[in-house]
């Protein structure tokens, strides 16, 4: 049943603006970060690592979570129109599968976004005249940060499910990103730590298990809440 739900959710993305958004929007932080790097090469001397700190300074703090929120708001958009909630909750599929189907599609689109960010980073590095190739460690940081989409997506799906507005959950994600940046400065921002945002050394210092466990705990929390909300929702 879960695969049927995933297939149905993917059909909603056909001919939508989601994929153009996941291609165009990451270009903005890539340009901003590269420009910032080129203006400060006298103090940013770690080359590929320094470029990474500048691109992720903008991308992780201001674009990553709002992009996921955008994807989530779009997937709930049809349910919030007319009487589509009746159709959604009347389908012969379990509540967990309905929610997890959406989350799986969100993770898939986020993965595409992250791959594109990696490509933009490599292109930016070459345009900036950096020698050699991108350090493999940085690509690992990018992949590790992708797993944060599981918990972020679970929360944003919950918010977009409850809030009918398309833009409000995205605004909440932006505010949360800024708040998370402040928390990160105190050493507790595991999402940003996962992607190693604005760092040229591994901020987790190899403690990947803590990051993965915290991601799973937050996912489980938001999933259980969403599951209860859906069960109590009137058809």
Locations of the language-model features?
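Generic transmembrane alpha-helix motif of multi-pass integral membrane proteins
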Residues: 9, 13, 89, 151-167, ...
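Transmembrane helix-loop junction
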Residues: 78, 91, 122-126, 161, ...
């Amino acid at each position: 049943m879960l695969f049927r739900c995933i297939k149905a959710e993917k059909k909603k993305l056909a001919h939508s603006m989601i994929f153009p958004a996941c291609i165009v929007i990451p270009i903005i932080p890539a340009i901003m970060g590269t420009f910032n790097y080129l203006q400060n090469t006298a103090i940013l001397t770690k080359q590929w690592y320094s470029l990474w700190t500048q691109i992720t300074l903008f991308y992780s703090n201001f674009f990553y979570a709002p992009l996921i929120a955008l994807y989530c708001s779009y997937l709930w958009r049809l349910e919030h129109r007319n009487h589509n909630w009746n159709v959604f909750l009347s389908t012969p599929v379990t509540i967990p599968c309905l929610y997890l189907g959406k989350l799986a599609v969100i993770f898939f689109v986020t993965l595409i976004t992250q791959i594109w960010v990696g490509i933009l980073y490599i292109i930016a590095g070459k345009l900036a005249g950096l020698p050699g190739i991108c350090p493999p460690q940085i690509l690992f940081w990018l992949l590790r940060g992708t797993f944060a989409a599981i918990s972020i997506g679970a929360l944003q799906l919950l918010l977009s499910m409850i809030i009918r507005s398309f833009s409000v959950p995205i605004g909440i994600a932006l505010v949360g990103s800024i708040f998370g940046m402040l928390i990160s400065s105190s050493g507790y921002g595991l999402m940003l730590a996962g992607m190693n945002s604005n760092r040229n050394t591994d901020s987790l210092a190899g403690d990947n298990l803590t990051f993965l466990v915290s991601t799973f705990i937050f996912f489980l929390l938001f999933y259980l809440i969403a599951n209860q909300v859906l069960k109590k929702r009137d058809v």
